[in-house]
């Protein structure tokens, strides 16, 4: 089960698509963070979800929310995917230990061996402000992001 509102978000360090280390607690110094877990790079639904989020970056900017994608794919796969699709936000590799961050956030589908479609919005205080998920074959609606982001205090 995905971390519920009020739960402490686990701190972590993962590499982004360019190999740079990203630490959640460092990101939180600049404001809330939306962790968007998807199963696999280059898959149809994952690509369409990230494209939609890139196109609606203003939704997150209005509340100073940093958008961060997370998959169990390798850094090299994520770089190729991000460059091909032109995503406007960092994508982190939860490749090894395989799915460790997704598991800690309650967002790992153990049967599939990949992240589930889950979103965890973490407030500056390191606590989950909102979370939601959808089935493996279902994109999360943009309205769910609007609702989650609107639960945050204005910057």
Q: Model-found features: residue ranges?
A:
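Chalcogenol-based redox active-site neighborhoods
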Residues: 1-155
């Amino acid at each position: 089960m995905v971390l519920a509102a009020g739960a402490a978000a686990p701190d972590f360090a993962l590499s982004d698509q360019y190999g740079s280390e990203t630490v959640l607690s460092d990101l939180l110094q600049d404001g809330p963070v939306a962790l968007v877990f998807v199963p696999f790079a280059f898959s149809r639904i994952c690509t369409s979800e990230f494209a939609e989020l890139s196109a609606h970056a203003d939704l997150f900017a209005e509340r100073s929310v940093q958008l961060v994608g997370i998959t169990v794919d390798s850094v090299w796969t994520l770089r190729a995917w991000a460059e091909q699709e032109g995503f406007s936000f960092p994508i982190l590799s939860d490749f090894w230990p395989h799915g460790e961050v997704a598991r800690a956030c309650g967002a790992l589908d153990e049967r599939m061996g990949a992240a589930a479609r889950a979103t965890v919005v973490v407030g500056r205080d390191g606590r989950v402000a909102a979370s939601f998920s959808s089935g493996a074959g279902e994109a999360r609606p943009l309205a769910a992001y609007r609702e989650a982001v609107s639960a945050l205090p204005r910057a």
